[in-house]
From Swiss-Prot:
This is Pre-mRNA-splicing factor prp12. Gene3D superfamilies: YVTN repeat-like/Quinoprotein amine dehydrogenase. Transmembrane segments: none annotated. The keyword Ubl conjugation does not apply. Pfam families: Beta-prop_RSE1_1st (PF10433), Beta-prop_RSE1_2nd (PF23726), CPSF_A (PF03178). The keyword Disulfide bond does not apply. Involved in mRNA splicing and G2/M transition. GO terms for cellular component: nucleus; U2 snRNP; U2-type prespliceosome. One of its GO terms (biological process) is spliceosomal complex assembly. It comes from the Eukaryota. Keywords: mRNA processing, mRNA splicing, Nucleus, Spliceosome. GO terms for molecular function: U2 snRNA binding. Belongs to the RSE1 family.
Amino acid sequence: MDTFPSLFLYSLTIQNSNYVQSSCAASLSGKKAQEIVIATESRLLIYKVDATDGRMNCILNQNCFGIIRNVAPLRLTGFKRDYLVVTSDSGRITILEYNVEKNKLVPIYQETFGKSGIRRVVPGEYLAIDAKGRAAMIASVEKNKLVYVLNRDSEANLTISSPLEAHKANNICFHLIGLDTGYANPIFAALEVDYSEIDHDSTREAFTSSEKVLSYYELDLGLNHVVKRWSKVVDRNSYMLIPVPGGNDGPSGTLVISNGWISYRHLQKAFHQIPILRRQAASANAISTPWNQVNSNSANDGPLIVSAVLHKMKGSFFYLLQTGDGDLLKLTIEHDGQGNVVELRLKYFDTVPLAVQLNILKTGFLFVATEFGNHQLYQFENLGIDDDELEITSLDFQAQDNEVGTKNVHFGVRGLQNLSLVEEIPSLYSLTDTLLMKAPSSGEANQLYTVCGRGSNSSLRQLRRGLETTEIVASELPGAPIAIWTLKLNQTDVYDSYIILSFTNGTLVLSIGETVEEISDSGFLSSVSTLNARQMGRDSLVQIHPKGIRYIRANKQTSEWKLPQDVYVVQSAINDMQIVVALSNGELVYFEMSDDVEGGQLNEYQERKTLTANVTSLALGPVQEGSRRSNFMCLACDDATVRVLSLDLYTTLENLSVQALSSPANSLCIIPMNVNGVSTLYLHIGLMNGVYLRTVIDVTSGQLLDTRTRFLGPRAVKIYPITMKNQNTVLAVSSRTFLAYSYQQNLQLSPIAYSAIDHASSFASEQCPEGIVAIQKNTLKIFTVDSLQDDLKSDIYPLICTPRKIVKHPNFPVLYILQSERNFDSFKYAQENGDVGSSYTKEKQNEHTSKSWVSFISVFDMISKKIIHESPLGDNEAAFSMTAAFFKNRDEFFLVAGSATNMDLECRTCSHGNFRVYRFHDEGKKLELISHTEIDGIPMALTPFQGRMLAGVGRFLRIYDLGNKKMLRKGELSAVPLFITHITVQASRIVVADSQYSVRFVVYKPEDNHLLTFADDTIHRWTTTNVLVDYDTLAGGDKFGNIWLLRCPEHVSKLADEENSESKLIHEKPFLNSTPHKLDLMAHFFTNDIPTSLQKVQLVEGAREVLLWTGLLGTVGVFTPFINQEDVRFFQQLEFLLRKECPPLAGRDHLAYRSYYAPVKCVIDGDLCEMYYSLPHPVQEMIANELDRTIAEVSKKIEDFRVRSF
């Protein structure tokens, strides 16, 4: 009996989440340069900042296969570079070293200290490092603290001790830092509360009298022991600690942050405190910041500091503290040089988006890891020393006095003055809904429309696969060229001098300078069409045309190689020293250049090779440094073959290998590319049928190996060599344009986000050193590829407040975005000002109540790419659901929005629910409200259903039809225990998702207008989204980051669909206090992100459909079904070997990670499989041998799944 699963999936991440869990500035490369280290949920990224233009370049993106909790730099005295200390859910503290040569993080130590997972008593939530790198303390939220002593051995290698315990039962830790004590014993400061009495007091008196304590834990390096050295009661509202530089740099100690106050405390040192500056209630010069519109501090509460960063300079230091409104405050500490603080000074600095973490680089950059929206890099323009901003001092505020009194502590918000924005890193957090559709303008590539963000920092984003480009020049030409080249005049030139444009009846030469203009003294024949052109030798140029070859020397002297009247050139190829041409009579002619005479000359090889098929393309390999010729050439013929010929001195034009193709080749290119640190010679082939091939040429034998295939589009593929980012790349032009390049030592093929082009060439000038010049019909264009790091381009369209749902018009390219926000004033204020968007971002920032709501629908035109209409909902309405439903009784589509009036999120109650029905006008660009219906619950889910509408109102599933004035209820079922979050429909089958109790299958019986529940899940799942994969199979996600597939048993499915089965379904005996039948679990996988949307789509033309999912943190991934069992067994074995040979970076067990809440089932982790590329060659070879494959075959298998998926 075959027990092999009928469903097996391959999980692959398309776009990683960029939500920052932790970040730091560190010198990992040891070259006196600083990098920014970003820890997302499961990845470590290293960014290098270019000091000249502020561009952030990602040099490393490494998957840890675990949940990262904290990351911090560590450097012992005398070391030249930093290590990284990482805490995660692995139950281990990990110390990583950055290997510059291999460009990877390598674990030095993985010290186990406790259980895996994230628990309140497992250390790792807090991480503190001694300023001199001598010790590290990790702490849990409750009870446990561990100290590790760090040292060096006799060979100057880092060593780590066994952990020293500093546990205390019934103790909650709120924050932990390492103090700067110079070379004295390391001290760690913790903010703690002892709840031993609170836990046993039912009167709550112990709670009201409890005290928050600042405790110092000292590590005695001599005795190798940790003791609590000092404790001091602090304000109960204290929540954050900031270390103060010590030793020769400052007075040491800690800053204690509480609600509205900053205080300085240290051992036997004077106490100082200063209030946190507040915004003026209504400032004449105040500007709005879109990140502080929601949850701003009320006038009665003191400001809260949410993040802080210390910057040391020679002889001084200062802090930047960020409030909950996004305002940066500059704090300086004046001290007497003897370890005593004189005063604290505080002033307003600038306003930036709300940050999870702030990092300052020594080169003068501030990195803001934002909570919502794109992360930002700022450059310091000033330090705020000589400005007119109000500066307050702690000398004006008496110790232990927590009342501001009448003193002026208010400032007015202004635009950026001390900082300037130089770079952004895209982030999709928080991603709430997604739609995949074909773009109306391109008609070629699927595009992803997402709504993300919170408050006025929300946006609609159009994601499409493609490297981002910048257009520099677009100029019309007198005709449509058939080819283009750029030429240098000398072999050593850095920049190009000529652009050669070939037309059907002539050639145009343009000179490149400050401007591009036509010239006539280049030596090129302008009366003929040019087939090929290139700079050869030291300073010569070559023009190949149908009737021969024109050789142009530096002094403009020319020589010609001419053909007889009835013979002409059909194809040609040129490199630095060689030329090969294919003639119309079937002959192949080969030339070599000699530098024996001044200016060089071309020497024809006397034996011509006769071919039996017509040549469609030729290619010559590059001439290596120190060599006089390339040893290989390739030719493609119309018999759908490609051949490799020898150009060796003794075997010239002899066949070395041949490969059959699926279609005649249209274009060839031989170019070396760097893969895994090794230069490999590749042959790139573009076929007539739109297929692109890449194959390796064995430099010893000339054999063609390891062929990779990709369908690019319906047009024939043209191949152009391009120099990009100091590497050899290849441009493949079809109906879309793709770039083949090497990124992080792996070959990638990505589309470029640019309109379709016809011909292209490299372009280098002083203004544009690495560009591409292209022909688009009769237009000359010059553009650049901005970065090779991210091949998912994002276009951003700002929204007013938090988006909830996105819906497309059934027939027109129009999107409808449902938005709602808590803590906003009535929407009427925006209408009175005449501009919805600006009113919410420019006025009345702090005038809101804690339970007020605003909701409206924005209409987005996908053609003009802007919001063209906004329709507000009623006062204090919270909107959650929307759908475009077809009502059969009206024979047209309507937009229906579901909302709740006076919604209380904590209690999940409301005055009443609402249905608002809108009619489409002007091809969906305008909405007309035609119906408003009040209902008795909160409509959390809406979907069209057989000419009517299904609504999930609380725990009830209802059928509604559109009446003349109201929505009419036509049927109802108490479908779930709590409340419905999602509804999926196929034919008469309905799947309803409950907030806690997984999903239930419902069947609709139209004969009796009955809804019947007939199957549900065996366990509880907190479902967030789901989609029907087929009639019986459902894919869903839950709030804990799992994606799963459930299938209704075949006999149960048939029973539910049978006619007259209603009575049997009603009277069947319940099983496990629920429905009579249970769903079977087919697959289960932990993604480490909360799925917010699932769609069954086809992302690659000609490939199978996949499951596309997006997560709240911004992750985009796919699940691809396996076609045969052989592939499943191959990847299962590969996954097993990789778990053993490539253990996760932070020490987490991979199988346990992917089985976080339930065992992983019938899913292969494609992200782990792709780690095969980064393994050393001996390990790759060992794994390939275990699989009875070659390294190339294993790599091809892995690559094929990514190609077929996205």
